[in-house]
Amino acid sequence: MAGTEIVMARLLDLFCGAGGAGMGYHRAGVDEIVGVDINPQPRYPFEFVQADALEYVAEHGGGFDAIHASPPCQAFSQAVKKRYRKGRPNLIPETRMALDRLDVPYVIENVPTAGVHMREPVTLCGSAFGLPIRRHRLFESNVWIWGILCSHKEYPRRYMPAWNRTNLLRVLSLSGGYQQGKTDIEEHRAAMGVDWDMDIKELSQSIPPAYTEYIGKGLIALLEGE
């Protein structure tokens, strides 16, 4: 509408990976998205900064209208064998502390087994968005967001859980990590709702953009109502 102020023009996407979360916010209507990751992300579809996410948000976070963070989940992921999880960083508390210092809405995303470290998270599932995957993920926020009930019966999973895999080098999981069973990468991208060139590893570490599109629309509606 002409003359309407844009209330969520800029979003900071921390630990951005290849952009699954960022793309969802873009589809929700966020004008500008800046992704930050310690590793190069050549297929990230928006402005990208290679940097330490927590150092970047401490210096620049106040210049954004909202912040999304997906701290590394290897300390909790069932795709990583238990004996290898020891010593993996749990950055959820440190990420929350950094975001709590800022007066902006934020969302923290992680895997279900990280739930004990998250504050009143809601769960999203691919089946709730008509996707043939489950990819359950938890979302914590300092503003109110709603979860959606799964629709496992209506949209059954076509892929086995990641922890049932036998060959980590040649196969892709749509539950997170690698899994037994090969399919065409275009099929995996379609199942995730990804329409840009993510590779196998990036897909395995991403979330479906539908999750943050849903959350982003809710954030925008909330901010417009203030």
Predicted regions and their residues:
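SAM cofactor-binding core of SAM-dependent methyltransferases
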Residues: 9-57, 68
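Short, Lys/Arg-enriched N-terminal segments with co-localized hydrophobic residues
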Residues: 1-7
